């Protein structure tokens, strides 16, 4: 399979994407939407299987290997700065404590966000990771050339009021939207709708998480309620998402068992949505999902996925 070969599955989502990104009136934005018809390698928090997640080292590795998108979670500090950090709290991936949005940027910059990786992965330990800083969005955007695309999540917007306005303002200042260099994702539908209102040219991805329903054995539900479960979802349900988004980002497995099927993927595509699956690290699962006609995969190991798709 060629790295950017158009998928064999006949997709209709491109025309829908153009409709839902206003005029799509710049060549670069139109090219981005066209590229979403091909398979996309999405580096989950950078090459986070090889270096501390959301660190400059992880991002640089993923970019050097040729990932299509560098994926990051965006949160807001107590003094209104945008930073790249996944968890709501600091303990897992830094030597800090408490909620990230309770700290100023200066306080966060004093933390070590790299040594935990060396302790967790001694075979991959690198002294250069010690003392890695939590990155601001501006630092990330300033580091990479204009050919790099980003896949940014509004993380926990209920804990980060104003994150949408701050993010859109920053992306506009860096000409990220008109140049076709950004996708925004969220589990929070209201957050995506707010971004769509702020700038309808931004391509959006609705994240979903399917898991067994507590009250009904064998039935799957989506945890935020944005869609029914995969076994009950209709064309109309997909179309409601396509009113504001160009794609779905979904889990493939729950507790080791598949929660979506190839038919689900094809139905989403037929209703105007690209389908990206998170987070896939095993080569056999990567290959299975590629064979299903997936539009892209999130992975901690972009090198594995790139080797598979070249």
Question: Where are the regions a protein language model picked out?
Answer:
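Bacterial N-terminal signal peptides
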Residues: 9-19
């Amino acid at each position: 399979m060629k790295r950017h070969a158009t998928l064999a599955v006949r997709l209709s989502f491109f025309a829908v994407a153009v409709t839902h990104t206003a005029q799509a009136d710049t060549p670069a934005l139109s090219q981005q939407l066209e590229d979403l018809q091909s398979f996309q390698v999405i580096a989950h928090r950078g090459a986070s299987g090889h270096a501390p997640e959301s660190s400059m080292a992880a991002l640089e590795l993923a970019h050097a290997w040729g990932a299509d998108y560098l994926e990051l979670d965006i949160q807001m500090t107590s003094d209104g700065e945008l930073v790249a950090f996944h968890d709501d709290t600091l303990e897992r991936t830094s030597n800090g404590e408490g909620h990230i949005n309770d700290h100023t940027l200066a306080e966060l910059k004093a933390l070590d966000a790299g040594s935990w990786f060396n302790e967790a992965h001694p075979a991959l330990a690198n002294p250069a990771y010690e003392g890695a800083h939590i990155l601001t969005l501006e630092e990330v955007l300033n580091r990479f050339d204009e050919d790099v695309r980003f896949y940014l999540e509004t993380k926990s917007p209920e804990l980060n009021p104003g994150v949408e306005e701050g993010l859109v303002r920053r992306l506009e200042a860096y000409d990220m939207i008109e140049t076709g260099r950004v996708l925004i994702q969220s589990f929070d539908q209201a957050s995506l709708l707010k971004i769509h209102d702020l700038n309808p040219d931004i391509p959006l991805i609705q994240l979903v998480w399917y898991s067994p329903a507590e009250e009904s054995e064998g039935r799957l539900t989506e945890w935020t309620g944005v869609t029914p479960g995969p076994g009950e979802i209709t064309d109309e349900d997909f179309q409601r998402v396509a009113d504001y988004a160009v794609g779905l980002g979904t889990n493939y497995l729950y507790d080791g068992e598949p929660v979506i099927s190839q038919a689900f993927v094809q139905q989403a595509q037929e209703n105007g949505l690209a389908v990206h699956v998170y987070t896939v690290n095993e080569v056999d699962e990567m290959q299975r999902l590629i064979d299903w006609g997936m539009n892209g995969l999130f992975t901690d190991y972009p090198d594995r996925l790139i080797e598979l798709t070249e």
